[in-house]
Amino acid sequence: MANVNIKPLEDRVLVQISEAETTTASGLVIPDSAKEKPQEGVVVAAGPGRFDGDDRVPMDIKEGDTVVFSKYGGTELKYNGEEYLLLNARDVLAIIEK
């Protein structure tokens, strides 16, 4: 997992995007123009949660979780040559348990 100096605020998470498949199961190479945008990644940083009155709502998502996120959610970032996505917690659809 990457060590980044980006700290998400409130209920946001920073996700390192998984690599898109470059070949099919039968060995055909998929060109960049035909690749699907990945919707899976690993949480490398998570905010403390949003405020509800004077209290913070705890986050269900934590650093190290592998998550599935909304296809069009978040803000793409490049940091130290790596691609990340900054998402609101509501854009995370599921946590993949291993």
Swiss-Prot record:
Pfam families: Cpn10. The keyword Cytoplasm applies. It comes from the Bacteria. Heptamer of 7 subunits arranged in a ring. Interacts with the chaperonin GroEL. The gene is groES. Together with the chaperonin GroEL, plays an essential role in assisting protein folding. The GroEL-GroES system forms a nano-cage that allows encapsulation of the non-native substrate proteins and provides a physical environment optimized to promote and accelerate protein folding. GroES binds to the apical surface of the GroEL ring, thereby capping the opening of the GroEL channel. This is Co-chaperonin GroES. NCBIfam families: PRK00364.1-6 (NF001530), PRK00364.2-2 (NF001531), PRK00364.2-5 (NF001534). One of its GO terms (biological process) is chaperone cofactor-dependent protein refolding.
